[in-house]
């Protein structure tokens, strides 16, 4: 009995919608709209999830020559659809170089230097944290909580902050104070290595 029910259900499900991006999905379910109009003719039917779906961007058949980068902060956009040669991104799993045609991935950013290579020009940003999304169509979306061009960092302030957080860590009595001081040390150490390296 169960076997018959599942085979009937699966045959109906596969007949209604296939797993393919080439097949267009119907915008609305016509039987649902007809049933809705019978029950409440004066109210427009609600939008169904199928109406909110967008088609996937096409995956190119050849590897593109450029990587499109969107680098966004909560208050501004550093790079919007900028075509570059490569990007080196600091992630919690390690630094990752991204070239055109890279496999689709998602990762969390860690404090470090984001390097954007465009021809012979190299631009470096210090990012505090965030996420990066690499799409199959050679688009990289980088969302950072805070980012500063490395050439705008003040070496003296970084050294002062590193000393201050080291003192706070040594004098901390609670776990919260220790963790806050450790985060400050991690960020200032990454800032210091960005300036020296």
Swiss-Prot record:
Belongs to the ATPase epsilon chain family. The keyword Mitochondrion applies. InterPro entries: ATP_synth_F1_dsu/esu (IPR001469), ATP_synth_F1_dsu/esu_N (IPR020546), ATPsynth_dsu/esu_N (IPR036771). It is found in: Mitochondrion; Mitochondrion inner membrane. It comes from the Eukaryota. Residues 1-19 form a transit peptide. SUPFAM superfamilies: Epsilon subunit of F1F0-ATP synthase N-terminal domain. This is ATP synthase subunit delta', mitochondrial. It comes from Pisum sativum. Its main location: mitochondrion. Pfam families: ATP-synt_DE_N (PF02823). F-type ATPases have 2 components, CF(1) - the catalytic core - and CF(0) - the membrane proton channel. CF(1) has five subunits: alpha(3), beta(3), gamma(1), delta(1), epsilon(1). CF(0) has three main subunits: a, b and c. Mitochondrial membrane ATP synthase (F(1)F(0) ATP synthase or Complex V) produces ATP from ADP in the presence of a proton gradient across the membrane which is generated by electron transport complexes of the respiratory chain. F-type ATPases consist of two structural domains, F(1) - containing the extramembraneous catalytic core, and F(0) - containing the membrane proton channel, linked together by a central stalk and a peripheral stalk. During catalysis, ATP turnover in the catalytic domain of F(1) is coupled via a rotary mechanism of the central stalk subunits to proton translocation. Keywords: ATP synthesis, CF(1), Hydrogen ion transport, Hydrolase, Ion transport, Membrane, Mitochondrion, Mitochondrion inner membrane, Transit peptide, Transport. One of its GO terms (molecular function) is proton-transporting ATP synthase activity, rotational mechanism. One of its GO terms (cellular component) is mitochondrial inner membrane.
């Amino acid at each position: 009995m169960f076997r018959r029910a599942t085979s009937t259900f699966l045959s109906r499900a596969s007949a209604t919608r296939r797993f393919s991006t080439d097949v267009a999905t119907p915008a609305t379910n016509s039987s649902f709209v007809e049933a809705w109009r019978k029950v409440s003719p004066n109210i427009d039917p609600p939008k169904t999830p199928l109406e909110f779906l967008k088609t996937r961007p096409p995956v190119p058949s050849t590897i593109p020559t450029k990587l499109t980068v969107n680098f966004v902060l909560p208050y501004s956009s550093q790079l919007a659809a900028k075509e570059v040669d490569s990007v080196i991104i600091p992630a919690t799993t390690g630094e990752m170089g991204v070239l055109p045609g890279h496999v689709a991935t998602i990762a969390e950013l860690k404090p470090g230097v984001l390097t954007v290579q465009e021809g012979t020009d190299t631009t470096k940003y210090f990012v505090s944290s965030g996420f990066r999304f690499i799409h199959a169509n050679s688009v990289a979306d980088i969302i950072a909580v805070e980012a500063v061009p490395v050439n705008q960092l003040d070496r003296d302030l970084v050294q002062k902050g590193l000393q201050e957080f080291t003192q706070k860590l040594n004098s901390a009595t609670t776990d919260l104070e220790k963790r806050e001081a450790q985060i400050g040390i991690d960020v200032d150490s990454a800032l210091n290595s960005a300036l020296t390296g």
